[in-house]
Amino acid sequence: MKFSAYLTTLFIVLFSLFIQTVQAESEVRIVIDEGVDSARPIAIIPFKWNGSDSMPIDVADIISADLRNSGKFNPIAVSKMPQKPTSASEVISDVWSSLGIDAVVVGQVTPNEKGYSIAYQLVDTIGASGNAGEVLSQNQYAVPKNAIRLGAHTISDEVFEKLTAIRGAFRTKIAYVVQKHGGSKPYQVRVADYDGHNQFIVYSSSQPLMSPAWSPDGSKLAYVSFENRKSQLIVHDLQSGARRVIAAFPGHNGAPAFSPDGSKIAFASSKDGVLNIYVMNLGNGTISQLTSGAGNNTEPSWSPDGQSIIFTSDRAGGPQIYQMDVFGNGISLVSAGRGYSGKISADGSILVMIYGDNIVKKDLATGVTEMLSSTFLDESPSISPNGIMIIYSSTQGLGKVLQLVSADGRFKARLPSSDGQIKFPAWSPYLNKN
């Protein structure tokens, strides 16, 4: 198999990026609410362990979970596997194709002094690529001991892209706010892997924190802080821990959103008495006001090309989503009815928003809408960088939890926390070059 030397460097970079953080007390974990029986079946065979003790983490289980979470695949249960090969040469294609499974992933994990060597092969069982039994993709990674999950997510990304022609987003992260039960600093901005693992605290405060937003290179978070008893916008460098106040105007300052090139931040402020959309140039600090007139304007979100901004306004009486260019001109209605918290996917094809109390997807080419959630009081949707998954918060019982739904609505899961309420999720951009 081909050895990817770049990966060891990637693991070091990704972990050093967050070196100044503190490990969180209680991690969130995915709890499946609705499966994907109608999705494409696939087999992720338990990886062979070449060590003397037990394997520290089930790599195949992580890969299965990733592919299942996308809504595109339905991994077969280990108990139903007709064979458990550990290499492509051991895969009996007819056995799998008779079950309707056209792709099988096999692999091995070998411990070494520095960590682990993880190798995998993706096997075509029906000959769609030419011959049954052909290896569609294969690789081998050297990973540090504390990065075995990242190695598994890397395999998931490669398998997903090979089978769908869509870049995988399983090595991305999510930022969110936790309000803990008690303590002197109960409000925390946290970051975790997209699936809730490897959670850590970015910042803790005695006052509320809100609305984290990622910079396009993933190195910074902008968020709202109510320290000093007033709302202010903070840009927080995740590597150095440095915090910069960029807006502390009288009234409310909120809903920060980085431009796609990272040079500007759009935000909402009521500094002149009415909530309006502003854009700040982060290089020189200049501010431009984009909206005006009666009504409140908030929740700015940039289009992928950086040429327009969608936002929520009640100028017509109730909250609706509008779009304007980056100078505040050409304002047009995007959502009919009670819509807010809009986000456009990275490819510009769909708009995800709150419509009524639920998550709704709108195809921007056809105008067709589809309700994706059936949870209660949904808020703050955020789309994965490949447009395949959506994370949001909802009310469950007396608290707030995170919810994950595939963009086709076929897979749904919860990411509850045992130590507080979770709000304001934000999906990171890609954190790796490929």
From Swiss-Prot:
Keywords: Cell cycle, Cell division, Periplasm, Signal. InterPro entries: 6-blade_b-propeller_TolB-like (IPR011042), PD40 (IPR011659), Tol-Pal_TolB (IPR014167), TolB_N (IPR007195). GO terms for biological process: cell division; protein import. It is found in: Periplasm. One of its GO terms (cellular component) is periplasmic space. Residues 1-24 form the signal peptide. Pfam families: PD40, TolB_N. HAMAP family: TolB. PANTHER family: PROTEIN TOLB, PROTEIN TOLB HOMOLOG. The Tol-Pal system is composed of five core proteins: the inner membrane proteins TolA, TolQ and TolR, the periplasmic protein TolB and the outer membrane protein Pal. They form a network linking the inner and outer membranes and the peptidoglycan layer. Part of the Tol-Pal system, which plays a role in outer membrane invagination during cell division and is important for maintaining outer membrane integrity. This is Tol-Pal system protein TolB. It comes from Histophilus somni (strain 129Pt) (Haemophilus somnus). The lineage of its organism: Bacteria, Pseudomonadati, Pseudomonadota, Gammaproteobacteria, Pasteurellales.
